[in-house]
Curated annotation (Swiss-Prot):
This is Probable flagellum biosynthesis repressor protein FlbT. InterPro entries: Flagellum_FlbT. It comes from the Bacteria. Keywords: Bacterial flagellum biogenesis, Repressor, RNA-binding. The keyword Electron transport does not apply. The keyword NADP does not apply. Belongs to the FlbT family. HAMAP family: FlbT.
Length: 149
């Protein structure tokens, strides 16, 4: 880390830091003085909310950060899922970004990958609403990723 990182948390808010879950009992500011893997509670996707292909990919990628002990297994599932998504999506912007996201995870930059996946949600919503991806394809992806939910 080139500089310190300061994060403000509200009372009762949780943060996932290097696999540990911390909850604060009052408004606090935390300053990270060195490299750390963290995820803010409002960026954590719950299993029941992983209802679309990209949200399912996000859920798997967040497991790499939240559960360091299972990172190898999560990364393996991420690889399988990203290959499936690249084969299912036809939108050039989504395909290019999926390849970049795969590279981010390969480089150990899962946090940045999560941001990139979230940025694709509006495009995915348009694709699914226009049924550019068939319901059968979406269901196939859901079944493949179901063990993670």
């Amino acid at each position: 880390m080139k500089s310190t990182l300061r994060i403000s948390l509200k009372s009762g808010e949780r943060i996932f830091v290097n696999g540990a879950v911390l909850r604060v009992d009052r408004k606090v500011a935390i300053e990270f003085l060195n490299d750390v893997t963290f995820l803010l509670e409002n960026h954590v996707l719950q299993p029941e909310d992983a209802t679309t292909p990209l949200r399912q990919l996000y859920f798997i990628a967040q497991m790499i950060l939240i559960n360091p002990e299972g990172a190898d297994q999560s990364t393996s599932m991420f690889r399988k899922s990203i290959v499936m998504l690249v084969n299912c999506f036809r939108n050039d912007e989504v395909l290019a970004e999926l390849k970049r996201i795969d590279g981010l995870v390969t480089q150990g930059r899962a946090f940045e990958a999560l941001k990139a996946i979230r940025a694709l949600y509006p495009i995915e919503d348009q694709i699914l609403n226009a049924q550019e991806m068939t319901p059968a394809t979406v269901e196939q992806i859901r079944k493949e990723i179901a063990p993670w939910r």
